[in-house]
From Swiss-Prot:
This is Proteasome subunit beta. One of its GO terms (biological process) is proteasomal protein catabolic process. The gene is psmB. The formation of the proteasomal ATPase PAN-20S proteasome complex, via the docking of the C-termini of PAN into the intersubunit pockets in the alpha-rings, triggers opening of the gate for substrate entry. Interconversion between the open-gate and close-gate conformations leads to a dynamic regulation of the 20S proteasome proteolysis activity. The 20S proteasome core is composed of 14 alpha and 14 beta subunits that assemble into four stacked heptameric rings, resulting in a barrel-shaped structure. The two inner rings, each composed of seven catalytic beta subunits, are sandwiched by two outer rings, each composed of seven alpha subunits. The catalytic chamber with the active sites is on the inside of the barrel. Has a gated structure, the ends of the cylinder being occluded by the N-termini of the alpha-subunits. Is capped at one or both ends by the proteasome regulatory ATPase, PAN. GO terms for molecular function: threonine-type endopeptidase activity. Its EC number is 3.4.25.1. The active site is at T9 (nucleophile). Component of the proteasome core, a large protease complex with broad specificity involved in protein degradation. It catalyses: Cleavage of peptide bonds with very broad specificity. Belongs to the peptidase T1B family.
Amino acid sequence: MDDKQYKGTTTVGIICNNGLVLATERRATMGNLIASRDAQKIYQLTDNIAMTIAGSVGDGQRLARMLQAESKLFELRRHGPMSINALSMLLSNLLWEYRIFYIQVLVGGVDKSGPKLFSLDPAGGRITEVKFSSTGSGSPLAYGVLEDRYKQDMSVEQGVELAAKALESAMKRDSASGNGMQFCVITPGKVEIFEREVGKQVCNS
């Protein structure tokens, strides 16, 4: 991968009993340089679906625009929204067909059957996650926290706190991760994206 590209790093996705939590840190690197301290790595795709990127920020931005456009066209043609499963399959096909996107993606949302989360590799490999997932250079550190502290039937409030702890663990040891956090909480009928400083608690869980 070209070191002159801006790269995003640690992302986390957690399935909760009443929704889905996606979280990322904000640093983007270009080789050994911290190129950005407020990189956008969460993108809302539809009224109930969002995705995170780890890897080339430019590739992630282009892919998000493609998915937003395709989901809008689908809705106009079919008179209804694209399902989470269908959008993740479209994403898988795009990644495989082009094979130029240097990114890992988490995509998920909430529909009639509940929260769903998928992880995809740069070649389009697609895995259905049943609890949580993490991508990027800090993911091994994030996974340690997720494996230890995840509980079945967590609320989204508890999911936000767990995601924050996982990101904080990655940011302490991974030089490509840092500079604050961004969260996306998806519940039935609502997508909320917000930021948070390291060390601050969003809610009491």
